[in-house]
Amino acid sequence: MFDVEKIREEFPILHREVYGKPLVYLDSGATAQKPRTVIETVDRLHRELNANIHRGVHFLSEEATVLYEAARERIAAFVGAAAKEEIVFTAGATASLNTVAYAWGDAFVGAGDNILVSEMEHHSNIVPWQMLAERKGAEIRVLPFDEAGALRTDLLPSLVDERTRVVAVTQASNTLGTRPDLRTVVEAAHAAGAVVVVDGCQGVVHGGVDVRAMDCDFYAFSGHKLYGPTGIGVLYGKRELLERMPPFMGGGDMVDTVTFAKTTYAPVPLKFEAGTANFVGAIGLGEAVKFMQRFDPAEIEAHEEALLRRATERLEGIGGLRIYGTAPGKCAILSFNVEGVHPYDMGMILDKLGIAVRTGQHCAEPVMDHYGTTGMCRASFALYNTLAEADALAAGVERAVKMLRN
């Protein structure tokens, strides 16, 4: 049985106060808080097992290597990969997406080709493709969304053609909460011979993922949004594609042999993991995944849907408040503005009430442009939030509106 109060006991930071008020943390879309098991695992690694992986024959190195590869195997199972070799550890989702843009893109995208990017993407799934297009003389095409925040998949036939090489799309919008119809996107892309690159930062947290069922070619996410440490991310890639890709960075541990005449590379995934690995981050992320595997994804999703529904119903009763992203099936992300109230002012007042939300453009400036606004307030819920906190958000917004309109 899903017991949110018991879950909250596992997150030490949720018991602190800010400005003398209980912390109401509604910014998990930016970074999620960490359960005690992750905190203790990271601490133990620094205290007891601090040694480079894949490089030593001594006990500490070998033990750290075993834990690192076990984390890779656990994460592979969690996302539904066919094998652990399809999991590449990176510095984060941004690094994962750039790896594909440089390694796959430079090898397989040419002048006159096109790259399709959805309008609702985070900058990390826009800018690398723009940079690739500039390097290669390719065209960027944009798949728009409608006023409700639903992706216009009906326009795919007019945007995907025989020169489309990459389709970049989010599993769940970090601003609107929209979960696009990925099956339709993948089918259209694959019919044209294009690869599909999915930003899974929000999707992997809200409802989980099965990359083989999704049939995406690449899937990227960050550990810190999945209750894991910062500075660690994952790139899933179909093995046959990873094997065709040249390395993105050169250095130690990604090589097989090195001579001045020729260098040969390690097999996947190691050929994409140059340099000293963030083994603490990877093992910590494995522990976060282990934490998540204790729960039924359907129960997490039902809990978060209840939070979203309660907050939405309460906020809709506030005069002049607009919610952005009303497509059915959205995840637990709620962005809004109040007429006549700047989002930064709203965020500052909520902060003084102990409520942490995100304000600004959310690294999704094209979404702001679509709605003609310079910023939004965003509440993003997690498995440790409560209905009382959803009510606190609404009460805080009501109080802020009264203060700022008087």
Model regions and ranges:
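Pyridoxal 5′-phosphate
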Residues: 1-406
